[in-house]
């Protein structure tokens, strides 16, 4: 990868972004195999498209992903998380369609970002057809969670922490969420790496060797920079997991939730004034409280699901009806809170990103 960073380009920006878009669209290969269901016409409904009766989403491709996820037998908590991610994706895609009509994404940069985000969702929930991503994944702890990490280093750290006696059950829950957050960062990094590799292959195939000395692509350099930032974040995350797994949680931690910790670390190195940084800190506290509320509902949903399965095995219609009603209410509340958390995270991440770019 390193030698490619020195490449230069005189190609028009639009042509380069087309190169980036094409490999992005090729990533979810199992979906493409379904024929016309994921064609451009199907993926770009009319601006005023309304949700069909009984469908979760207004966009057909998202309904198809949702149905596929349900066939994978993901846990209720995991399905609720996916639902929130798809709702965010739907909102962003519909907003992008309005921008496109107004001619505000002529270079295709926002479209490329949307495709990247969808590919991250496919990888995160095992919808990309890769066997190693088909594992059951849960935010809740159980006896078999070690197998979900998929990395011997993480499994060793987790086993050491779990058997050290340094953590209460609540702290183990918190540490487990940190491990899952770290795993998701690796997945996002791999999606970006795959995207960049495909873009560069297309880039080299398009150009003759004589052109290479005169080419500089701001787009590819930007992607390499993002890749380096993500790798730095992954390395810092692993260092933190090692430290916490060996030493336990200290009493001086500013924040506890891994996503909030990441945002705070980024904010401190961004171009914020002292007043802006303090304001951001306060907002992060509110965000963390929102995450904790969401975590609480996730746990209640898991408990309700187990109870419903037990009642169904007994076969008492009255108890089944009552427990099912409670389960459905918890499921909807968990989805709603999940959407709010992800939207808030997106907004906070954008603010930090803008501040960091202003500094550059």
Swiss-Prot record:
GO biological process, one term: amyloid-beta clearance by transcytosis
InterPro entries: A2-macroglobuin_RAP, Alpha_2_MRAP_C, MG_RAP_rcpt_1, RAP_D2, RAP_D3, RAP_sf
GO function terms (MF aspect): heparin binding; lipase binding; low-density lipoprotein particle receptor binding; receptor antagonist activity; receptor ligand activity; very-low-density lipoprotein particle receptor binding
Top-level taxon of the source organism: Eukaryota
UniProt key word Membrane: no
Keyword vocabulary terms for this entry: Coiled coil, Endoplasmic reticulum, Endosome, Glycoprotein, Golgi apparatus, Heparin-binding, Phosphoprotein, Signal
Post-translational modification: N-glycosylated.
Motif (Prevents secretion from ER): 357-360
Keyword Glycoprotein among record annotations: yes
Chief location: endoplasmic reticulum
Tissues and organs where the protein is expressed, per its UniProt entry: Highly expressed in PYS-2 parietal endoderm cells and in the kidney. The RNA level increased about 10-fold during differentiation of F9 embryonal carcinoma cells to parietal endoderm cells.
Region (LDL receptor binding): 240-356
Family: Belongs to the alpha-2-MRAP family.
Function: Molecular chaperone for LDL receptor-related proteins that may regulate their ligand binding activity along the secretory pathway.
Descriptive protein name: Alpha-2-macroglobulin receptor-associated protein
Organism this protein belongs to: Mus musculus (Mouse)
Source taxonomy: Eukaryota, Metazoa, Chordata, Craniata, Vertebrata
């Amino acid at each position: 990868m390193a030698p490619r960073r020195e490449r230069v380009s005189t190609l028009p920006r639009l042509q380069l972004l087309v190169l980036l878009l094409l490999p992005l669209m090729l990533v979810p290969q199992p979906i493409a195999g379904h024929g016309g269901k994921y064609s451009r016409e199907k993926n770009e409904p009319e601006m005023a498209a309304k949700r069909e009766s009984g469908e979760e989403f207004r966009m057909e491709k998202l309904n198809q992903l949702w149905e596929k996820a349900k066939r994978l037998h993901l846990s209720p908590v995991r399905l609720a998380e996916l639902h929130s991610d798809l709702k965010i994706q739907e909102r962003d895609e519909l907003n992008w369609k309005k921008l496109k009509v107004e001619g505000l994404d002529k270079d295709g940069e926002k479209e490329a970002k949307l495709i990247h985000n969808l590919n991250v969702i496919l990888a995160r929930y095992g919808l990309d057809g890769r066997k190693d991503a088909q594992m059951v994944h849960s935010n809740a702890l159980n006896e078999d969670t070690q197998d979900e990490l998929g990395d011997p280093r993480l499994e060793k750290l987790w086993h050491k922490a779990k058997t050290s006696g340094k953590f209460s059950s609540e702290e183990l829950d918190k540490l487990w969420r940190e491990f899952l957050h770290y795993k998701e960062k690796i997945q996002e990094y791999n999606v970006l790496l795959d995207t960049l590799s495909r873009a560069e292959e297309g880039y080299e195939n398009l150009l003759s060797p004589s052109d290479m000395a005169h080419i500089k692509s701001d787009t590819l350099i930007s992607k390499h920079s993002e890749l380096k930032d993500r790798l730095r974040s992954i390395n810092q995350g692993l260092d933190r997991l090692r430290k916490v797994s060996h030493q336990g949680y200290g009493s001086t931690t500013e924040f506890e939730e891994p996503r909030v910790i990441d945002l705070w670390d980024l904010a401190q190195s961004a171009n914020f004034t002292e007043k802006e940084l303090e304001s951001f800190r306060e907002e992060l506290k509110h965000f963390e409280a929102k995450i904790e509320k969401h975590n609480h509902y996730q746990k209640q949903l898991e408990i309700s699901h187990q109870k419903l399965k037990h009642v169904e095995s007994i076969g008492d219609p009255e108890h089944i009806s009552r427990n099912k009603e409670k389960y459905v209410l918890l499921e909807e509340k968990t989805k709603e809170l999940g959407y709010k958390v992800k939207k808030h995270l997106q907004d906070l991440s954008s603010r930090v990103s803008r501040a960091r770019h202003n500094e550059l």
